Amino acid sequence: MKHFSVKRLLGLSSVLLVTLGASMHAQSYLPKHESVTLKNGLQVVSVPLENKTGVIEVDVLYKVGSRNETMGKSGIAHMLEHLNFKSTKNLKAGEFDKIVKRFGGVSNASTSFDITRYFIKTSQANLDKSLELFAETMGSLNLKEDEFLPERQVVAEERRWRTDNSPIGMLYFRFFNTAYVYHPYHWTPIGFMDDIQNWTLKDIKKFHSLYYQPKNAIVLVVGDVNSQKVFELSKKHFESLKNLDEKAIPTPYMKEPKQDGARTAVVHKDGVHLEWVALGYKVPAFKHKDQVALDALSRLLGEGKSSWLQSELVDKKRLASQAFSHNMQLQDESVFLFIAGGNPNVKAEALQKEIVALLEKLKKGEITQAELDKLKINQKADFISNLESSSDVAGLFADYLVQNDIQGLTDYQRQFLDLKVSDLVRVANEYFKDTQSTTVFLKP
């Protein structure tokens, strides 16, 4: 499951923990949602929260990410995210953000492997204007050369900052370069620097015309709202927008070949003083039934102060300054990723060895029922806590809507609470195999 936020309820009282534990199989706390599809194929989803805060979040989700790019044109989905805040038929470049700030809202966007997401967080009084702004960018984006060229340099600088000059950013990028050899997951959403510097406006317009269409988008409104009003205003602003191409949205055809052995890469980088390791294993795609158990393993192994990685590598053995795990849950064949940064004089190979040792312990069944019960209690506490925020609820729904798997979201909580120790042991043995591993060492 896409985790609702990095927030962890470390200060949760014992009374609340007991209460949650006692009602482990209580009713679903997931807020109800309503959905309509406009004549142009745009899906509109409303998730009313009965919190009387007056706060809403308006999202526009495009079913496109770096997964939809091709070799030589990497990073275009992310570039379009930047250009979407430039000029339109009726707005000057930067005016979108200025209008949002004037009515007291906050706007931003993100691009991942599988989704591009734009949002405005504001008061319910600004629902109409927020939808109007998003309809303007969807239907009337200019994409001009004099805006494209400077923004391309902004993105190149972002690549230097987040990837080239960041040890963990470089490690992350090189991991995907190594784990995937054919599929577009071979690169992360920022793309390769050479591609960034050689995009043309023609490339951008072609990508935009394919994927930024109403039939490939979802409008999601969460918070203190009335669903009927959401649908009426969405129809008012979006239904007149035309799809640019009546053909079906193209889907990536590049299927990653089956990995037939362990992969290892060593990266040496100037300015790196401590050693790092990224270790990952191929796991099934987003909708697979084992994803819930993999999520639980991610919590057990590498999330929070009591996780196995934190306890062993950071606190007990003092080998790492930080260590964590992440179940990526990508739309196509995915990865379960571990990253650890070594303390002075600690070799990356030693970090890898310790992570593998913990996995072998897990595969032998050395996890207790008490540990699993704690995972369930903490997961449910996180879940309930995040339902208080329109932003967190929007994030929760976004991935499942784009994957057309809202039933998966509905079932998730029950499936997590039904997990058995044997489920975690089975999944660990199924996927944490050396032949399916990719290891990248980052060294000075």
From Swiss-Prot:
Its EC number is 3.4.24.-. Binds 1 zinc ion per subunit. Zn(2+) binds at H78, H82, E158. PROSITE patterns: INSULINASE. It is found in: Secreted. The active site is at E81. GO terms for biological process: proteolysis. Its cofactor is Zn(2+). Can function alone, but full activity requires the presence of the non-peptidase homolog YmxG. It comes from the Bacteria. Residues 1-28 form the signal peptide. One of its GO terms (cellular component) is extracellular region. It is an enzyme of class 3 (hydrolase). Keywords: Hydrolase, Metal-binding, Metalloprotease, Protease, Secreted, Signal, Virulence, Zinc. Disruption phenotype: Essential, it cannot be deleted. One of its GO terms (molecular function) is metal ion binding. Belongs to the peptidase M16 family. Virulence factor that cleaves the cytoplasmic domain of the human junctional adhesion molecule A (JAM-A), compromising gastric epithelial barrier function and cell-cell adhesion. Cleavage of JAM-A occurs after Ala-285 or, to a lesser extent, before Ala-285. This is Zinc protease PqqE. The gene is pqqE.
